[in-house]
Amino acid sequence: MYNWLAKNGYKCAKSYMDKDAFFADVEVGLISYPVFVKPARGSASISISKAYDKETVELLFAHEDGLMIQEFLNGQEIGADVYIDMVSHEIVSIFTKKKLKMRAGETDKAVSFKDKKLFDLIEDFVKKAGYNGQIDIDIFDVNGEYYISEVNPRFGGGYPHAYESGANHMCLIVNNLAGRENECAVGKNYKVGTYMMKYNEIMIQHS
């Protein structure tokens, strides 16, 4: 995905499967520490390490196979729940939230917001990539510039936030399954400033 994003002119975190290519780019100033070292095929932020020097990168690669190196983006992480109509193949809903707290790769606390610049970027990206149906996009706002981080072709763990804010993608799916085309509601179908917070619950019952 990194190669496709870079080729099509989208800002994204520099990514390397070859550590020697990464070290070479460090030498010429194309990337600097810290960086993330993580499994190329991973999930839930498992086995992700933040490396501050070459020795740490070498150590991590020596102890585990299938790793990649990714540029550290120091900015606000954003989640976007997007629905592309499966009849018209047009984007009909985008819900965006600022991630305020993360746990095990999932959003623990977030607040909804809207930005036309971000909506325009998502629409352009989705059309060029050719996605369809429900997708979940991770984005970073770094000094006012949006970087696309990753895309998952499914509902994200924080989708209940979108649903409770008004972005009912379940209804959109039902309409499409019935052969009905959905109307575009980008920027119109949810409220700004809605917070979502997850919590753990414990119940003790005495016999």
Model-derived regions: residue spans:
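Gly/Ser/Thr-rich helix-start
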Residues: S43, I48, Q76, G157-Y159, ...
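Active-site nucleotide/adenylate-binding loops and adjacent lid/helix of ATP-dependent enzymes
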Residues: M1-N74, M86-S88, K116-F119
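Predominant activation on well-ordered alpha-helical scaffold segments within soluble catalytic domains
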Residues: Y2, A6, E58, D81, ...
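Broad gene-expression machinery/nucleic-acid interaction feature
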Residues: S32-P34, E77-G79, Q134-D136
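ATP-dependent carboxylate activation and anion-phosphoryl transfer catalytic cores
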Residues: K114-S207
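Phosphate-binding site of ATP-dependent enzymes
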Residues: S49-G130, F140-D141, E145-Y147
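A short, flexible beta-alpha/helix-coil linker loop
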Residues: R41-S43, K101-A104, R154-G157
